[in-house]
Structures are given as C-alpha cells and as structure tokens.
Amino acid sequence: MKTCHIINRVGLSGVALLLTVSFTVSAVSENKRVDKFISCDNLTKSQIAAQVKRDFLQNRINHWSEDRKQLGTSKPVVWVKAENITGDKEILKIPLTVRGSKRDKDYRVVVDCQQNTISYSELK
C-alpha cells in the first residue's frame, strides 16, 4: 500500500514538473523573436531602416496576433529613423515605433550583420 502511494506521488510530481517545463518553453519560444534577415553588406542606414520596416509589416505583424490585438489593427503605421540607428557594421540597434488604432508600441530591433539575423524585443 505504501509503495503504491509513493508511486502515485512521484507520478503526480512528474506530471506537474512536465507541465511547468512545457509552459515555460512555450512562453520562451513565443517571446523569442529572432529570424533571418537580408545581408547588410553595402547597405546604408537608410536602406537598413527601410528593410526593417518592410520586415515588420510583411513578416512579423502577420504572425504576432497578440501585438495586432494590442495595436488594434493588422495594418499599423511603422517608422524607423535612420539617424537613430546605433552600433557598428556587425551589430545594429534600431528603434522601431509602431502606431495602431488602440495604442503605440516601441520595439528594439537588433540586426546581426554577421549572422544575417533580426531580433525584436518590445520596450515597455
């Protein structure tokens, strides 16, 4: 009887741990907003700003349902000022502002020109 009780407790603990880990992993993957980006070679800051804006409007907002919901639209107004881009030729940090019908959102975009990746994080 005691053995059966111990096995049940261990089993329930294992299930609880598994659920916790699965929720954590799904939250991390949802917040991890990294994807491939075009090569930065021979692009000016203005061209990179235009590519970031295009990437957000064509690729990101269509897949980020929570952001669309918060903004109140699937067609927000997006702007990037090339003069606000910081960093060197390898890593560029780009402030991105998005305006919807419900609210505005600001993102920090990092373009890794060596890895050809783009990552988004929301500024709160």
Swiss-Prot record:
Main location: secreted
One Pfam entry name: YebF
Compartments it resides in: Secreted
Keywords of this entry: Disulfide bond, Secreted, Signal
Disulfide bonds: 40-113
Domain (YebF/Cmi): residue spans on this chain: 36-123
The keyword Secreted appears for this protein: yes
A single GO cellular-component term on record: extracellular region
Domain of life of the organism encoding this protein: Bacteria
Stretch forming the signal peptide: 1-27
The keyword Metal-binding appears for this protein: no
Alphabetized HAMAP family for the sequence: YebF (MF_01435)
UniProt xrefs under NCBIfam families: PRK13680.1, YebF_not_Cmi
Similarity comment text for this entry: Belongs to the YebF family.
Protein name: Protein YebF
Organism from which the protein derives: Photorhabdus laumondii subsp. laumondii (strain DSM 15139 / CIP 105565 / TT01) (Photorhabdus luminescens subsp. laumondii)
Phylogenetic placement of the source organism: Bacteria, Pseudomonadati, Pseudomonadota, Gammaproteobacteria, Enterobacterales
Gene giving rise to this polypeptide: yebF
